Amino acid sequence: MSLTKADMAERLFEEVGLNKREAKELVELFFEEIRTALENGEPVKLSSFGNFELRDKNERPGRNPKTGEEIPISARRVVTFRPGQKLKSRVESYAGTREEQ
């Protein structure tokens, strides 16, 4: 199962008491702020969750898996996410309980 923006809005509606329109707008604005910051080259730091940052990748050689032909992979900018320590700890403890089942 994956978490969608609609799921997040529904949770805000149920648990915070926002109406559905407000909940949807809040979720959209949250992601728009992240997009805008990244578009402006700014890192996004969400306390206890993690950081989104832009990273420039240089051009590098690649290979077409079907033909084996070497082809260049162009330079590009990518978004990276580094989880915070609290998120890592929670995920690791959850993963440990699933392995025991």
From Swiss-Prot:
Function: This protein is one of the two subunits of integration host factor, a specific DNA-binding protein that functions in genetic recombination as well as in transcriptional and translational control.
Protein family per UniProt: Belongs to the bacterial histone-like protein family.
Pfam families: Bac_DNA_binding
An example Gene Ontology CC term for this record: cytosol
GO MF, one annotated term: DNA binding
Organism: Halorhodospira halophila (strain DSM 244 / SL1)
Superkingdom to which the source organism belongs: Bacteria
HAMAP family named among the record's database cross-references: IHF_alpha
Keywords assigned: DNA recombination, DNA-binding, Transcription, Transcription regulation, Translation regulation
Protein name: Integration host factor subunit alpha
Gene3D superfamilies named in the record: IHF-like DNA-binding proteins
SMART domains: BHL
One record GO biological process: DNA recombination
Oligomer status and interactors: Heterodimer of an alpha and a beta chain.
Keyword Phosphoprotein among record annotations: no
Cited InterPro entries: Hist_DNA-bd, Histone-like_DNA-bd_CS, IHF-like_DNA-bd_dom_sf, IHF_alpha
